[in-house]
Amino acid sequence: MRISTLLSYAGGFREAAEEVAELEKAGLDVVWVPEAYSFDAPSAMGYLAARTERLTIASGIMPVYSRTPTLLAMTAAGVDYLSDGRCMLGIGASGPQVVEGFHGVPYQAPVGRIRETIEICRRVWRREKLEYQGKYYEMPLSANRGTGLGKALKLINHPVRDEVPITVAALGPKSVEMTAELADGWLPAFYLPEGADAIWGEALRAGAAKRDPARAPLEVFSGGAVAIGEGLEAQRDRARPQIALYVGGMGAKEKNFYNRIF
């Protein structure tokens, strides 16, 4: 078991980084750096790489719609270099409220895009000349979609590792199945052990059946909220706004997987 913590995307980062450095001394194993529509995660991850020595620095998460797969791979390789092999690339689809509302990009085919992103990232880290013909991504871009002058290039720098671990934030059945098949880790939101099998069990088993046996078993980062303080009701009151944000504010009214979890 590894112990991790998630930074707030709305708090003061310098103060949080100091706290993370102290938590590392106490035994913290992983720190998740969120992004949403706040400051970008990689800037904070690079800063944490300089302020820590041992713990894993994970993006939690970067949307696949806000960057090309190759830029995600380049960024993860850069943070991995700065941290001497301590980066974990956490990716996900986010949601249409952020992707279309903040980035102005159509929220289309999230499962397929994440699948192709994983495949492309691993090719980049192996420093292959990148030639990829997917449904959503094409490298080099063909003449009928671009100028036809694109070249198959490989990453200039040598990454610290042949692969940076990829963790996927997934909630829907198809996304969870794809994660269990391809990813190194799974980051579910509001994981409730007593209901996990009913919600995700079938998808996890279906994905595991297609998983490459040479790849290590899927690591599950099933964190729960922990409040430290006096009085049970007071701590519940502290948790209510965050839960209400996701249950009531994230996702459309008619299609909200967070609501299904609860």
List where the protein language model places each region:
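Conserved, mostly hydrophobic/aromatic
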Residues: G27, L48, V79, C121, ...
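N-terminal small/glycine-rich loop or linker at the start of catalytic domains
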Residues: M1-S8, A58, P96-V99, E138-E163, ...
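Active-site-adjacent beta->alpha loops and helix N-cap segments on the catalytic face
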Residues: F39-G46, L192-G207
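Short, acidic/polar
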Residues: G11-E22, T75, A170-M178
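Hydrophobic faces of well-ordered beta-strands that scaffold small-molecule active sites
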Residues: I3-L7, V31-V33, I57-G60, C87-I91, ...
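N-terminal beta1-alpha1-beta2 module of alpha/beta enzyme domains
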Residues: M1-S59, Y65, V164
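Glycine-rich anion/phosphate-binding loops
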Residues: Y65-G78, Q108
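An alpha-helical appendage that flanks or caps ligand/catalytic pockets
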Residues: Q108-L155, D197-F262
